[in-house]
From Swiss-Prot:
<keyword id="KW-0067">ATP-binding</keyword>
<comment type="pathway">
    <text>Cell wall biogenesis; peptidoglycan biosynthesis.</text>
</comment>
<dbReference type="GO" id="GO:0008716">
    <property type="term" value="F:D-alanine-D-alanine ligase activity"/>
</dbReference>
<keyword id="KW-0479">Metal-binding</keyword>
<feature type="domain" description="ATP-grasp">
    <location>
        <begin position="106"/>
        <end position="301"/>
    </location>
</feature>
<dbReference type="GO" id="GO:0005524">
    <property type="term" value="F:ATP binding"/>
</dbReference>
<dbReference type="InterPro" id="IPR005905">
    <property type="entry name" value="D_ala_D_ala"/>
</dbReference>
<keyword id="KW-0963">Cytoplasm</keyword>
<dbReference type="InterPro" id="IPR011127">
    <property type="entry name" value="Dala_Dala_lig_N"/>
</dbReference>
<feature type="binding site">
    <location>
        <position position="268"/>
    </location>
    <ligand>
        <name>Mg(2+) 2</name>
    </ligand>
</feature>
<feature type="binding site">
    <location>
        <position position="255"/>
    </location>
    <ligand>
        <name>Mg(2+) 1</name>
    </ligand>
</feature>
<keyword id="KW-0133">Cell shape</keyword>
<keyword id="KW-0961">Cell wall biogenesis/degradation</keyword>
<protein>
    <recommendedName>
        <fullName>D-alanine--D-alanine ligase</fullName>
        <ecNumber>6.3.2.4</ecNumber>
    </recommendedName>
</protein>
<feature type="binding site">
    <location>
        <position position="268"/>
    </location>
    <ligand>
        <name>Mg(2+) 1</name>
    </ligand>
</feature>
<dbReference type="GO" id="GO:0071555">
    <property type="term" value="P:cell wall organization"/>
</dbReference>
<dbReference type="GO" id="GO:0009252">
    <property type="term" value="P:peptidoglycan biosynthetic process"/>
</dbReference>
Length: 306
C-alpha cells in the first residue's frame, strides 16, 4: 500500500445535494480526520458548494468519495472525476449507477442465480390489490434509486399499497414493491477482493429503516454475527459474487436477510457506505483486525480512473 505522502493532495468529497447530505457530512469528517491523523494531505470538498473543476484548479490528485445517495453514488460524481482524470475511491460510473438502481440490481442478480426477494415495479397505473396478492403481505414498497431506506414503507394490508407508492414516488419515479422476508438482517462488507466478517443487525421493531439506522439507540450490531462458520463462509462468497456481478470494485457493502430456513436473500449493494467510526464497514474491518485509519488508507489506495 502506498505511503501517506504518496497520495498527493486528497479531496474528501462530502455533503452534496442528496437526501443523505447530513450523513455524508458525518462520514466525510470521520474519513478526513483519519486521513489527516495518518499524515495524508487531505481537505474537505463539498460539490454542492464548489464546481467539480475546482478540484483541478486547487491541485487535487486523488478523491475519496464520502458522498451518499443521489449524485454521489449513482455514477454522477464518478463520471465527473473520470472527465477530470482524478483517481477516486469505490466503483466506476456504470457499477455505481447499477447498484443505486435496486430494480436493475435485482434483474442482474436473478439472471446469475443470486437469490433476491420477488418484486414488481410500480407506477400509478398498477393494480395495487393484485400486487399485494402476488407478493403476499406484508410487503415492502420503496424508491428504486434512493438510499438509507428513505421513502420505504412496510405494507400490512392491500389497501395501504397505494399510499406507500405515493410516499416512495415523492423520492423517485421508479418505485419497487418487494416481498417481505422475515429473518435475520446481515451485511457483508467488501474490501478489495475480500468479503469481511458479517455484521448482524438487531432492531427493536421489525424493520431496519432510517429511524433504526440513524436515530434509535436501541438498534444492536453483532460481529461476529453468530451465523455458523460454514454458512458465514458461503454468504461472504455469495456477497462477493453479487458485488462483482454489478461491476463494483474497491470497496462496498451488500445487504441481505437470512430467512428462518437459513436461506439468504440479497437485497441491495452499496458502493459508498457510511464511514463514521460506528458504521457497519468499519465494524467489520475491526473484526478482521483492521483499524479505522488503516481501512481509510486501504480504500484510498484502491482509488482508480477508468
Amino acid at each position: 500500500m502506498a505511503g501517506s505522502h504518496d497520495f498527493g493532495k486528497v479531496a474528501v468529497l462530502l455533503g452534496g445535494r442528496s437526501a443523505e447530505r447530513e450523513i455524508s457530512l458525518e462520514s466525510g469528517k470521520a474519513v478526513l480526520d483519519a486521513l489527516r491523523s495518518s499524515g495524508v494531505d487531505a481537505h474537505p470538498f463539498d460539490p454542492s458548494e464548489q464546481h467539480m473543476d475546482a478540484l483541478l484548479q486547487q491541485g487535487y490528485t486523488r478523491a475519496h468519495i464520502a458522498l451518499h445517495g443521489r449524485y454521489g453514488e449513482d455514477g454522477t460524481v464518478q463520471g465527473a472525476l473520470e472527465l477530470l482524470g482524478i483517481p477516486y475511491t469505490g466503483s466506476g460510473v456504470l457499477a455505481s449507477a447499477l447498484a443505486m438502481d435496486k430494480w436493475r440490481t435485482k434483474l442482474l442478480w436473478q439472471s446469475a442465480g443470486i437469490n433476491t426477494p420477488r418484486h414488481i415495479l410500480l407506477d400509478e397505473q398498477s393494480d395495487f390489490d393484485a400486487v399485494a396478492k402476488e407478493l403476499g403481505l406484508p410487503l415492502i414498497v420503496k424508491p428504486s434509486r434512493e438510499g438509507s431506506t428513505i421513502g420505504l414503507s412496510k405494507v400490512r394490508e392491500a389497501g395501504e399499497v397505494a399510499a406507500a407508492w405515493h410516499l416512495a414516488a415523492r423520492h423517485d419515479a421508479m418505485v419497487l414493491a418487494e416481498q417481505f422476508i422475515e429473518g435475520t438482517e446481515l451485511t457483508a462488507s467488501i474490501l478489495g477482493d475480500v468479503a469481511l466478517p458479517l455484521v448482524r443487525i438487531q432492531v427493536e421493531g421489525d424493520l431496519y429503516d432510517y429511524q433504526a439506522k440513524y436515530l434509535s439507540d436501541k438498534t444492536q450490531y453483532f460481529c461476529p454475527s453468530g451465523v455458523s462458520e460454514e454458512q458465514e463462509c458461503l454468504i461472504r462468497k455469495q456477497a462477493l459474487q453479487a458485488h462483482r456481478l454489478l461491476g463494483c470494485e474497491g470497496w462496498g457493502r451488500v445487504d441481505l436477510i437470512l430467512d428462518k430456513s437459513g436461506t439468504p436473500y440479497f437485497l441491495e449493494a452499496n458502493t459508498s457506505p457510511g464511514m463514521t467510526t460506528h458504521s457497519l464497514v468499519p465494524m467489520a474491518a475491526k473484526a478482521a483486525g483492521i483499524s479505522f485509519e488503516e481501512l481509510v488508507l486501504k480504500i484510498l489506495g484502491l482509488a482508480h480512473v477508468g
